[in-house]
Amino acid sequence: MILNRKSIIIILLCFIFINCSNKDSTTIHPTGFVDPSDSSGGSGGSGGGDTTQLDVQLMYPLDDQTKLFSTTWGAHQRTFIVHVPPNFDSNYSIPLLFVLHGYTSSATAIHSYSGFDQIADQENFIAVYVQGTTDLNGTTGWNVNVVGTFDDVDDVGFFKALIQYFKTDYNINSDKIFSCGMSLGGFMSYRLACELEEINGIGSVTGSHAVYYTCNPPNKKNIIHFHGNADAVVPYYGTSWSVPVETVHDFWANNNNCQDQSQITVPDFNNDGLQSTQFISYNCDENTDVVLYKMEYEGHTWFHQDWGDDLNSSELIWEFFKDK
């Protein structure tokens, strides 16, 4: 059964209300996925070609190292939270990590539960929590070809302009620009990997690729993904609108020309007797890697050991990125 966009919105809202706690044309295959070798293009909403300089305004500080900023992109006011590590000095370039919230959520929420401020302080990078736009229903989200009410938003162009802003004003390391996100924020991070050469790698926690989206990556990418196989919101094995998670993994392994794959059992930190699995595709071009954590009997959540999970996705995301 093929669901229309309105049905998808209703289903996502229902599932997120029940399940989400955050404890928060080209070749289409039968799976609905895209062959990375096909360069014929296809639909994908607004592109990322506009590099207009942003007029960024400070709204207010949250603390000495964290500030809320606003700007305008297209017809939308955009806001984002910036956290810089202690003793930040723009004379020295450091990495940048975008952190993206899920559908109906906010930058404030993922800033609160992800814990990336503390990791940024320890590892010396800038964390930027970007707020999605709000549709006419008052719902927040991203243009990722899943929820139709965001189709007119040029999110990719906005992130391209943000990257230029941080290069100019913060002197970030151009070779170490990353994005990660929860749920629809994971979808958005994948879209950035598909369209922006500047993105070195992405992390997805319970996100995926949209079935109705063409991904033609401009270069090789480092990919790390966490997903529960009992996720009822963005199912591990896919839906009519989201690609199966292991198919996404295989796509990026193919894109990166990875030659080998291994499977490792995740340590049972919470002693529940369930064995999760880490899939690693390696020996890839340009020293990239593609990693998938299949979390056994886990649902739609940001994984954290303090919440009873076997691992901390935030710590592992940065551990993966730091040497890339």
Regions found by a protein language model. Give the residues of each.
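C-terminal catalytic histidine-bearing segment of alpha/beta-hydrolase fold enzymes
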Residues: 222-226, 242-244, 255-324
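Serine-hydrolase catalytic machinery in alpha/beta-hydrolase-like enzymes
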Residues: 71-87, 91-178, 188-191, 195, ...
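Sec-dependent N-terminal signal peptides
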Residues: 7-16
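The conserved beta1-alpha1 loop
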Residues: 98-104, 206, 227-228, 296
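Acidic catalytic loop of the alpha/beta-hydrolase fold
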Residues: 230-234, 300-301
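A domain-start/cap signature at the N-terminus of enzymes
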Residues: 20-96, 122, 151, 177-203, ...
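Conserved alpha/beta-hydrolase "acid-adjacent" motif
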Residues: 232-244
